UniProtKB/Swiss-Prot annotation:
It is an enzyme of class 3 (hydrolase). InterPro entries: DBP10_C, DDX54/DBP10_DEAD-box_helicase, DEAD/DEAH_box_helicase_dom, DEAD_box_RNA_helicase, Helicase_ATP-bd, Helicase_C-like, P-loop_NTPase, RNA-helicase_DEAD-box_CS. Its EC number is 3.6.4.13. It comes from Schizosaccharomyces pombe (strain 972 / ATCC 24843). The keyword Translocase does not apply. The Q motif is unique to and characteristic of the DEAD box family of RNA helicases and controls ATP binding and hydrolysis. One of its GO terms (biological process) is rRNA processing. SUPFAM superfamilies: P-loop containing nucleoside triphosphate hydrolases. The lineage of its organism: Eukaryota, Fungi, Dikarya, Ascomycota, Taphrinomycotina. It holds the Pfam family DEAD. Residues 330-480 form the Helicase C-terminal domain. PROSITE patterns: DEAD_ATP_HELICASE, HELICASE_ATP_BIND_1, HELICASE_CTER, Q_MOTIF. Residues 617-627, 789-812 have a biased composition (Basic and acidic residues). This is ATP-dependent RNA helicase dbp10. Residues 22-43, 610-650, 768-813 are annotated as: Disordered.
Length: 848
């Protein structure tokens, strides 16, 4: 460890600490500085560890940057550094640079990072550094909870790679494995347990595990843990953990339920998130298309066919994965192919839809159109989910249809295009969607379909991004005059293209019964989705009416062609508008009723028409211009600005007038400068988790179309032949399966405590405090066995035969009859003895 220091290096370990050291730690240091004071062995160990950590630091660059630029500057031990470099890590990722120093200081951390950003190593490396080695007679000291078995097995593999060179033992506790095998694993007192919440809680209740020795807890993919319904299990596990633990929580997004859980389970947590993840890339180009609800499918096909020009299934060229026929090399070849697919294909496109029913419908429609499509939604099976993602990453498919919930944390390559089939109800959801493209200096496109009912959400997004809204083609001459990276360019799609594709969609849906059923189910699911969708602001709702009534809403988007084409489209649209809005000058009652043929009914209709006509003309005239689309600056003007604009004709008094506002207590009714932009982008420094999490909360609507918290009602019970409340199935009341109450008060199924562990323990030859795994961790085979019989058809027949003769000479492998009688033999001997006594009918000679 001393080899990391040189005479030219300066120890700046104190400046590396982003936050003040705990008062208890300072008191311990003061105690150690006093020579004459008695110190316990545990304090000595902590003091030595802190000194080694400080002496092991090596930093480059400026002091006090608050984060480490390489792994050597983090104060890690040499064994762990060798394991890190052997695994191929050269430099820490951004999430690792921000998280590892905080974890080494013992802080509780809430990290927001997507899958593939290095978050697993961000919490495994500090864990290995914290545990260092196995302690004598110690129980489990680290617990990692993952949402599914695949992620748990992947995490335990990473833990074993980083713990090479140490004697730390790690096990995976997941479903689908026999309980007896996991009884043995947990009875061996492993140092690190990587588990899924359901199976771990089952074993905790069954084995009556004591979790007081846990020092390090990680909730990996925490948003997916809550999404999959593990809230009750997590609450029960959290209640059993000691308060002195260090808790980590990693998530791709930050739902409100997760924030409440973090407040209850973490002590003064630090929110770590990457600023680049919360902003729209400067290289992102976006276009917005006004469509009707019935034309959305045709508009989607128009974007794919005429704008992106996505190749059809026959022209897709997947990435080669090597020798797939060899099963031993197939997995390795697949890993290499997936690793090399990070750049993505130039045509890779992500389509966001509101519900899982839309995923099924839209993906099937795109397949009918000839595209290669992958689909993912929240309740999709994990194996099918991985297959769909791998097909997309390998280039076998170039379209991925997903929901907001299903796309969280998915490790997908850099995308070229993102299409919002439904407009996101929140600006943060829009940023979450389009953040998949325009990464690593590459350009990307985001296309959004906006219906009349979505106009308010579009204006909310415009205020959030602080960009001007360009709607009418008269504002721009060609697409070169538009800046798609700095403006919100809104317009419709060419009507002839949409009409042709709409006719094709209607014909395909009418012919295919399955597609027609999927369309009906998606329409019903969207109605439920609208009930749970957030509403736009009141001001945006008012402006949305003006936007929809303007001519710019129906004019073509400047993305299509030059100005002549746009003008031709406008004339065509104007002609259609005139035809559709044509009103005859006379009603049916007035035709031929003039002069001497005039009737009383015709006169009544003429008077009525003259009275109603001015109102109709006024309502049909659309406004050609919209109110200022840029967000108004409602900040209070400064004194210098007022003096420049308004000149006083004369000084009222030589004495300067005093301001009525007290700078310390006055609260202005004006919004602060750039308040809208700051509300969207401002990220707290992290000193207060509640304040920082308030800006990072992202609640996504469930892709099932219904809200989880509102699940209720009744269901038909076939056994009781009547309707029963669904809530009874969850709390175990009124005839539902028997339950037990956990330590935290959570109701758990009674099957969690079935007595199988007691039966297993009784069948083993060790007690409750004994371990079936040897404590010295070194194993040596002492059993003497006979060599395998010689095979005369092998080349080593004579050599193997010689070994067999030598073994027999030493007495190895010779069967010796056991002198111990079995229970059956003992019983038979007793019966024979009783028969002899009865036959002789006289006592033995000893009793004469």
């Amino acid at each position: 460890m001393s080899g990391f220091q040189t005479s030219d290096e300066v120890d700046i370990s104190n400046s590396l600490k982003a936050f003040p050291v705990d008062i208890a730690t300072d008191n311990q240091k003061d105690k150690h500085e006093n020579v004459g004071e008695n110190v316990s062995d545990e304090d000595d160990g902590n003091y030595i560890a802190s000194k080694l950590l400080e002496s092991n630091r090596r930093t480059k660059g400026k002091k006090g940057n608050g984060k480490a630029s390489n792994f050597q500057s983090m104060g890690l031990n040499q064994t762990l550094l060798r394991a890190i470099f052997k695994k191929g890590f050269k430099a820490p990722t951004p999430i690792q640079r921000k998280t590892i120093p905080l974890l080494l200081e013992g802080r509780d951390v809430v990290g927001m990072a997507r899958t593939g950003s290095g978050k697993t190593a961000a919490f495994v490396i500090p864990m290995i550094e914290h545990l260092k080695s196995t302690l004598a007679n110690s129980n489990t000291r680290a617990l990692i909870l993952s949402p599914n078995r695949e992620l748990a097995l992947q995490t335990v593999k990473v833990v074993k790679d980083f713990s090479k060179g140490t004697d730390l033992r790690s096990v995976a506790i997941v479903g689908g494995v026999s309980l007896e095998e996991q009884f043995s694993l947990l009875s061996g007192k492993p140092d690190i347990v990587v588990a899924t919440p359901g199976r771990f809680l089952h074993l905790k209740v069954e084995m009556k595990l004591e979790l007081s020795s846990i020092e390090y807890v990680v909730f990996d993919e925490a948003d997916r843990l809550f999404e999959m319904g593990f809230a009750a299990q997590l609450t029960e596990i959290l209640h059993a953990l000691p308060t002195s633990r260090q808790t980590l929580l990693f998530s791709a997004t930050l739902p409100r339920t997760l924030v409440d859980f973090a407040k209850a389970g973490l002590q003064d947590p630090v929110l770590v998130r990457l600023d680049v993840e919360s902003k729209v890339s400067a290289d992102l180009q976006s276009a917005f298309f006004s469509v009707k609800t019935a034309e959305r499918e045709a508009a989607l096909l128009c974007i794919l066919q005429d704008i992106i020009k996505l190749p059809l299934k026959d022209n897709v060229r997947p990435r080669e994965i090597g020798n797939v026929n060899n099963p031993k090399k197939r997995k390795r070849a697949l890993e290499l192919a997936l690793k090399g697919s990070e750049s993505g294909s130039p045509d890779s496109t992500l389509v966001f839809v509101p519900t899982k029913h839309h995923v099924e419908y839209v993906s099937e429609l795109l397949v009918q159109a000839g595209y290669s499509v992958s689909k993912i939604y929240g309740s999709l099976d994990q194996e099918a989910r991985l297959n769909e993602i791998n097909n997309f990453r390998l280039g076998k498919t170039n379209l991925l249809v997903v929901t907001d919930v299903a796309s969280r944390g998915i490790d997908i390559p850099l995308l070229a295009n993102v299409i919002n089939y439904d407009f996101p109800p929140q600006p943060k959801v829009f940023v979450h969607r389009v953040g998949r493209t325009a990464r690593a200096g590459r350009t990307g496109w985001a296309y959004s379909l906006v219906r009349a009912e979505d106009a308010g959400y579009l204006l909310d997004l415009q205020l959030f991004l602080n960009r001007p809204l360009v709607t009418s083609s008269k504002q721009v001459k060609t697409d070169s005059d538009c800046d798609f990276t700095k403006q919100i360019v809104l317009g419709s799609l060419p009507q002839e293209l949409v009409a042709e594709l709409l006719e094709w969609v209607q014909r395909i849906v009418s012919r295919d019964v399955e597609l027609q059923q999927l369309s009906n189910v998606a329409a019903r699911g969207e109605k439920l989705y609208f009930r749970t969708r957030a509403t736009c602001s009141a001001e945006s709702a008012k402006r949305a009416k003006e936007l929809v009534d303007s001519k710019g809403w129906s004019s073509n988007n400047p993305l299509f062609g030059d100005v002549s084409v746009i003008e031709a489209e406008e004339k065509y649209a104007e002609l259609l508008s005139k035809v559709s809005s044509y009103r005859p000058s006379e009603t049916v009652f007035e035709i031929g009723q003039r002069g001497h043929l005039k009737t009383e009914a015709a006169e009544i209709m003429r008077k009525r028409r003259n009275k109603v006509k001015p109102k109709g003309i006024k309502s049909e005239v659309a406004s050609d211009k919209i109110t200022d689309s840029s967000p108004g600056n409602m900040s209070e003007a400064s004194e210098s600005e007022l003096e420049e604009v308004f000149k006083n004709p004369k000084e009222l008094s030589k004495k300067k007038t005093t301001d009525f506002k007290d700078k310390e207590y006055y609260m202005s009714h004006y919004a602060p400068k750039e308040s809208i932009q700051e509300t969207g982008y401002a990220i707290n420094s992290g000193e207060n988790f509640t304040t920082a999490a308030r800006h990072a909360i992202l609640d996504l609507t469930n892709d099932e179309g219904i809200e989880q918290s509102r699940k209720g009602g009744q269901r038909w019970d076939p056994k009781k032949k009547k309707f029963v409340n669904i809530i009874n199935d969850e709390d175990g009341s009124k005839g539902s399966p028997k339950i037990i109450r956990g330590e935290s008060g959570v109701k758990l199924p009674a099957t969690y405590r079935s007595g199988r562990f007691d039966e297993w323990k009784a069948s083993k030859a060790f007690g409750a405090n004994d371990s079936p795994i040897r404590e010295n961790k070194r194993y040596k085979h002492n059993k003497l066995q006979t060599p395998k019989p010689a095979d005369k058809f092998r080349d080593n027949y004579h050599k193997q035969n010689k070994r067999n003769r030598e073994a027999k000479e030493r007495g190895i492998g010779i069967k010796v009859n056991s002198e111990l009688k079995s229970a059956v033999e003992i019983r038979k001997a007793r019966e024979l003895k009783e028969k002899r006594l009865a036959k002789n009918n006289r006592p033995s000679k000893k009793h004469r």
